[in-house]
Amino acid sequence: MKVVNQPLRKKDAMQLVTGQPVYVDDVTPRDCLCVKLLRSPHANAIVKSINTTAAMKVPGMEAIFTWEDVDQNGRRYTQAGQTYPEASPYDRLVIDRHVRFVGDVVAILAGADEKCVDKAMKLVKVEYEVLEPVLDFHTAKDNPVLVHPEDNWESLAPVGADNRRNLCAHDECGNGDIDAVLADCDVVIDRVYHTQACQQAMMETFRTYCEIDTYGRLHIISSTQIVFHTRRIVANALHIPKSKVRVTKPRIGGGFGAKQTAVSAVYPAFVTWMTKKPSKIIFSRVESQIASSPRHEMEMHVRLGANKDGIVRGIDLHTLSNTGAYGEHGPTTVGLSGHKSIPLYGKAEAFRFTSDVVYTNHMSAGAYRGYGATQGLFAVESAVNELANILGMDPFKIREMNITHEGEIMPAYYGQLNTSCALDRCLARVHDMIDWDNKYPCRDMENGRIRAVGMGMAMQGSGITSMDVGSATLKVNDEGFYTLLIGAADMGTGCDTTLAQIAAEVLECPLDNITTLSADTDWSPYDSGSYASSTTYVTGKATEKCALELRGKICALGAKLLGCDKAQVSFDGKEVRVEEGENAGKTISLSDIATASMNGNSIELQATVTHSSEISPPPYMVGAAEIEVDTETGEVTLLDYAAAVDCGTPINPNLTRVQAEGGIAQGIGMTLTESVTYDDRGYPMENSLFQYKIPARVDIGKIRVEFENSYEGEGPFGAKSIGEVVINTPLPAISDAIRNAVGKRFYELPITPEKIAMAALERK
């Protein structure tokens, strides 16, 4: 292949590194209304009264909107970017009289500049009726205090939700008699694991600009992964026709799932629709920490049974998930905790997976890279590592005996066949990369420091089966260059480049001959959005099919112009050539074909293709960590992280490697330092990046990523996804390495130096 599987530079690389104006705040006017939100200081309260008189006297103030400006009995909406009908419940109003977490919206203020809005915000007088909050997600289900007591709460999908029980979702599934199988096992690991809420901490905070266009429509320019879903969300929130809303996306300064929720779009949209004036909201870092959409906190009870020979016979998993004050992504994230962990163990005779997602008076959770699989894999992989310890087996060996293989039906994966899998090769590759046999389990450095290794494996999906939709439009322009139109959102992942590579490979042209335009609801073909590891696999396949269709049209018009049948010609990317018949050898250039198509022609040199997949082939990953632990202080130094990934055919190895390295770094942070915590009143404790500790470059050591390619027949040129699976292995790998160093296994993240030092002290 000449373009696909080549390490080409991102199309927008130079513009980004040279600081060109490409982001929301760069490309939108400065002379617009500044929008800010007055937020609740209480975790659960009713606004008894609100007085904005003094605030509105501040020079420059345009408007202040409160719950009195919103129909409290109107239909609610969800901010979750999901295909309609969304699994997430309709539980929000633009401004609700009932505030449900510290940071919930009490009023929307709009003024000429930030200074006047800040001054006005201090003058708004609010009287609250403070209610008892639900802060412990263990006691939320069937708690007498209801987070959503309202009658207009609504669940559109059959996910087991019941607002009268504080249940956002409930599910049960399984196969075989799990209790009988576990009773017959030689060893049963029975443990409870806890993973914390974590922030995506993207560099660009949430932000949106809105204006009324020439036709009286609401034009939204937002940093979002989901332009089409945002159109529906805003229309639902404002109770206006979707035809009155247009959403576009400039470059995005990071998303990682956070911008799969319309966190910021609704508020300036409300202001602009009401005032008919342009407006903009830019979340501060504090707001992005206390009122965003972090990873769901989860607790997983795992029972894993095996024989003495190490064969895993059954897995029983119950997941309790904390969705916070609103249900965005709650019903769907929890499913991945089981359906993206249990299937790794293909020998299992039985499984059971049950889950509850509960409302609490914490910040609403949302989507974050890994989307529930991260949490479940920490639990299941940690249980397998403990099983290996008990049986005296090597963790690599026990996995080699149990993993799913190509051609097998995967347990707990909806009956899907494993159509492409190099997991066995990934295990062997990482085993050698980390020099496992010489380092496992640990080495005493005789200076108060111990070096140890640990490992874990992971899977994810490639889009959502029979739901995610990707589309592409390709057209030939004069001189024979192409325009590729997509609805997917490049949020730094490089899909504007990789999708163009797919098209260029089919059309046999240089990458520079394809101009990519993306993510505008008015002219982009429909795309569900950039999430669920779907862009390369789903939209990429649409692009491949679209390019093939356009190639056929080029040949058809070329044949017509050459006076022969389409079956007689070939196309090499530059010209159409007659291969047989009386005109054999005659050619016409693509440039001439393009020019001819614009004069007296009825063959359109444009194609649009939409694609959805009935399967979601998993990418796989194995990771191993080498750490050094200071037994006196508990400090963990990550020396080396070795990983092997099976993502099918990497479309762009450079971008694929960067995806993997970035995901591993985020997994390191979740394992060792990052956590969203609250005090006993529901106040978030980490409201800046000083308190919320993401790993810096010096904290992540050496990261090495290699690829073991399988070939996925349903993907473009054999490709599967890469974006999410890469965050999942550091959690079990590093935690297992810590156990091997200090002799104590940790079941709750993050594993801080304090916890490790105490464990080392207890061991002494």
Where is each model-derived feature located?
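Short acidic, glycine/serine/threonine-rich loops at helix termini
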Residues: 74-79, 120-123, 231-233, 256-262, ...
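C-terminal catalytic domains of large/alpha subunits in multi-subunit enzymes
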Residues: 67-68, 239-244, 274-279, 308, ...
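Conserved catalytic cysteine-centered active-site region
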Residues: 85, 97-98, 241-244, 248-249, ...
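Catalytic phosphate/nucleotide-handling subdomain of diverse soluble enzymes
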Residues: 462-524, 539
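Flexible, low-hydrophobicity surface segments
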Residues: 1-160, 188
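Helix-loop-helix junctions that connect adjacent transmembrane helices in secondary transporters/permeases
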Residues: 147-238, 403-481, 623, 685-706
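Glycine-rich loop/linker segments at domain edges
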Residues: 6, 12-15, 82-85, 161-208, ...
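Thiamine diphosphate
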Residues: 232, 253-276, 280-283, 495-503
